[in-house]
Amino acid sequence: MRYQFRKFFEMQNVKYDYSSVHIDVPNPLADKMIDWGKEKIKDSDIFVSQVDPSFGREDEMHVTVLYGIHSESPEEVTKIISGHKQISVKLGEIDVFTNPDKFDVVVVKVISDDLDELNNKLTSNVEFTSKYKEYKPHITLAYVKKGKGWKYHGLDQWKGKEFQTDYVVFSSKNGTKQKLAL
């Protein structure tokens, strides 16, 4: 909670190109993941950008349901998710998303039919832009320098952990965040 609280207030009023919907990883699991990343992922492996401070270590543990939403208002999303069942999540191994740019992304795989279903509902009903063809739910641990992520691939300390949530967070491109009940 300590990291999420700090990051939440630091990121208020930051403008983005798009809005998004995500679920929070609950505490104490979120704090344990942040602490693990600080202990196990070497500082020398971390990718940082002078232009975009969102890179580096992730300190707001979440699973994105959909990024790229054009609207800055949560109204449409609220209607779509209304009555959706509680979301159940199971964690998998650590994986690496490669990127043609200067970094790779160290992530924890997320297995959840509920998230897949909610992503499908949103992509079928809201205007959005995405450069990704396939939804791959995950929790980002850190952005690392190109080629440095593979040493963490397959680690399984989070594998099998589960959590549930009965809300999503609408993160508006205008910088505000709002919890939306399912």
Predicted regions and their residues:
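Histidine-dependent nucleotide/RNA phosphoesterase domain, centered on the 2H-phosphoesterase fold
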Residues: 8-182
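Short linear clamp-binding motif
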Residues: 1-9
